[in-house]
Amino acid sequence: MTKPHDFKTRAIIVRKTKCGEADRILSLLTPDLGLIQGFAKSVRKTKSKLSGHLELFCYSEVSLARGKAIDTVTGSQTIQSFLNIRSSLQLSAMAFYVCELAFHFSPEESANPAIFQLLLSTLEELDNTTQAELCTKYFEIHLLEMSGYKPELRECANCHQKLLATTNYFSPESGGIICPDCRNTQTGIPISVNAVKVLRYIQENDIPNIYRLKINREILSELELAIRANIRFVLEKEPKALLWLDSLSRANL
């Protein structure tokens, strides 16, 4: 989609970077333009009228003027600020994490309304749900699928035989779960029958349905190990927000 000289777009602020003494470069995920960059002049000044509308994971209608190298933010009006998330360290860390993933998995200026809607729905759920960890797992699994990295969960990703009801192995390199026989030639993380069932259920259902799941801490830990390994393999690095999330978990905050 070609941008006019002056344009408005709905956007979620997924990253902000300091620039100069008072400016910022904003990464904006939009439904119609994909990931775009915006220069926000003087937004870090205390008297800036825009600063409150351009916070991280804020959902706003943003006005921009097209530039040669980067577009300039000329106005912004908040649509949703997600106050419940902002009042909780744990929820804020999760919101930072899903925004970081959305940033890495969204190519610049290539519209992907499905990823935009997934991120928006996830932020809305985090702002209201009591099952934030499950909500985050839903986001991770569906983001991988929308980005072309859907893990194989029904058959061995290596030999393509139907998986048996036994301990199998999650292998990002192979593209999903592998059977014990293929584990002899491939690396993989042990994953239980129940954890595989939960992964399948999350992958195949909408977000309201996943709250029916009753998952213990052991299963959540298995899911976390497998999904993190998959994301790390795709990105070839660890998302920075995980450091904050893990530190909060260790402190039981």
UniProtKB/Swiss-Prot annotation:
Keywords of the record: DNA damage, DNA recombination, DNA repair
GO cellular component: bacterial nucleoid
DNA damage among keywords: yes
Coiled-coil positions: none
Record carries keyword DNA damage: yes
Pfam families given in the database record: RecO_C, RecO_N
GO biological process, one term: double-strand break repair
Gene3D superfamilies in alphabetical order: Nucleic acid-binding proteins, Recombination protein O, C-terminal domain
Family as reported in the entry's similarity comment: Belongs to the RecO family.
Cited function: Involved in DNA repair and RecF pathway recombination.
PANTHER family for the chain: DNA REPAIR PROTEIN RECO
The protein's name: DNA repair protein RecO
Naturally occurring in which organism (per UniProt): Dehalococcoides mccartyi (strain ATCC BAA-2266 / KCTC 15142 / 195)
Phylogenetic lineage: Bacteria, Bacillati, Chloroflexota, Dehalococcoidia, Dehalococcoidales
